C-alpha cells in the first residue's frame, strides 16, 4: 500500500454520466504504461449487495471469480483491464454498517459511542487501503452524485485520506455534465461550477474536471471551467460521446488526461502502448461483416440487465471483424408465429422467475427445428432440457421445480446440498433466504472430448462462473442422450454443466455464465464460436 497512489472519481449534476467507463478508461491508460492498476467501486445503498435486487431496479448483477455479487461496473473494470477482480473491489454502505455494528458487538471499540466519524469513516478507509495492496494505482469510483445524503461520509473519508497520505498520493477527478441548450445553441458550464462548489464545501477539491458534453468545448469554455473550478487549464478533459465505450481511453489520451496525472504524482511523461487496443476498437466501429442475434429475454425495458452478455457479443464481433446486431425478442410475447426473418442465431440468457418462460421454450424449439445456431445460458440451458423433454421425449409435464414444485417430470430441480468454492457443504431448501444461497463464482467444468465445447475452449477442463440455485436432474439423462441431446460438461459431484444437440449446426447449453469472463482482448471461446456459427448462417 505504501507505493499506491489513489485516484478518486466522483460525479456531479446528475447520475449515469459514465463514472464507471471513465474510471475504467483512466485505469486502462495507466495499465498500458506498465503500472499495476485496479479499481474499487463504492455503492452508497444500504443493501449488503445487489444479489436480491431486481434487474429492472439495479441492472445486471456481476459475479466475480470468488463468488461476490457486485455492481455491473465491476464487469466494466474486468473487461477493460483484462483481469479478474474480487469482492475487495466493491463494497456497499450495507457492508460498512454491518462491519461496524459487528465490531461494536465484539467490543472492539472499547465501549465508545459509535459514530459516523470516526468509526464509519475509518472502516471505509480501511477497505480502500486494503484494496490498494501491491498496486501502483487504485482508482476509486464513488457511486451516486455529489450532494446526495447517502454519499456524505464517503467524501469525508476521502478528505481524511488525502490529509493522511499527502497531496502527492491523491487525485480527485470530478465527472460533470455540460448541458447543451438547443434553442440558444449554447453549452452551459453553470451546473459544473455549482457541483464543484458543493464538492469543495464538503472538503474535497478536484484536480481534474472530466466534462461530459454532447459537443466539443472550445478553448474559451475550457478556460472558463478551469478558472471557476480552480484547476489548471489542461486539467479540463472533455468527454464527448463515442461510437464505442472502448474508444474512451483513446479519447481521454487525445484530450491529455495523463498530463495532469503525471504532474500531480511527480511522474515522467506517460506513454501508453495502445496499438493493439486501437486495432480492436477500429473493428468495432468499422467492421467488414454483420450478423443478427435474436436475444430472447424478459428484462428488455432495462437492457443493462444483460450488460455483460451484450459486451461479450461485441468482443466476439471485434475478433471476427463483425458487427453483432441484436434483435430484442420479448419472451412474454414470443410464439411460433414470431418473425425471425434475418435472424442468424438465437440466444436465451439467464434469468429468474416464471414470467416469459413459455416464450423462451418456444424460441428454443424453433432454433432446434429451424437449425438456427442456439446458445442457452444458465436458465437458457435448463429450458432447453425442458423443451427437449416435452417435445422430443413426449414428457409433457416436464418442468423446473422453480416454476412448479409438483410437476410430473422435474427435469430441473433444487439440489439439497452442494460443495461450494471452499469445498464446504452448503444446504439449501425452497425456504432458504434468497441472498447468498446460490452456487456462486468460479467452478471447474470437465469437458467431453470431440464436443463443440472442447473445440471452442481447446482444453479438457475449464473454470467458469455460476449464479444459480437449480440444477439439471440427471435422472432423465439416458433418455435425452438416446435421442441425440448429449451431456458434454460436468462439474463437481457430477453436476451437469453443458449440453449439445447432435445433427445441428450449433446447439449448445451451458449452466455457467460465459459472459462474465469475456474481455475485449480475449473474448469467451464458446460465445466466439456461437458468433462464428451465426456468421456462417448469415
Curated annotation (Swiss-Prot):
GO BP annotations listed: 'de novo' CTP biosynthetic process; pyrimidine nucleobase biosynthetic process
Stated regulation of activity: Allosterically activated by GTP, when glutamine is the substrate; GTP has no effect on the reaction when ammonia is the substrate. The allosteric effector GTP functions by stabilizing the protein conformation that binds the tetrahedral intermediate(s) formed during glutamine hydrolysis. Inhibited by the product CTP, via allosteric rather than competitive inhibition.
Signal sequence bounds: none
GO MF: ATP binding; CTP synthase activity; glutaminase activity; identical protein binding; metal ion binding
Other observations noted: CTPSs have evolved a hybrid strategy for distinguishing between UTP and CTP. The overlapping regions of the product feedback inhibitory and substrate sites recognize a common feature in both compounds, the triphosphate moiety. To differentiate isosteric substrate and product pyrimidine rings, an additional pocket far from the expected kinase/ligase catalytic site, specifically recognizes the cytosine and ribose portions of the product inhibitor.
EC numbers on record: 6.3.4.2
Matches recorded under InterPro entries: Class_I_gatase-like (IPR029062), CTP_synthase (IPR004468), CTP_synthase_N (IPR017456), GATASE (IPR017926), GATase1_CTP_Synthase (IPR033828), P-loop_NTPase (IPR027417)
Protein name: CTP synthase
Organism ancestry: Bacteria, Pseudomonadati, Campylobacterota, Epsilonproteobacteria, Campylobacterales
Quaternary structure annotation from Swiss-Prot or TrEMBL: Homotetramer.
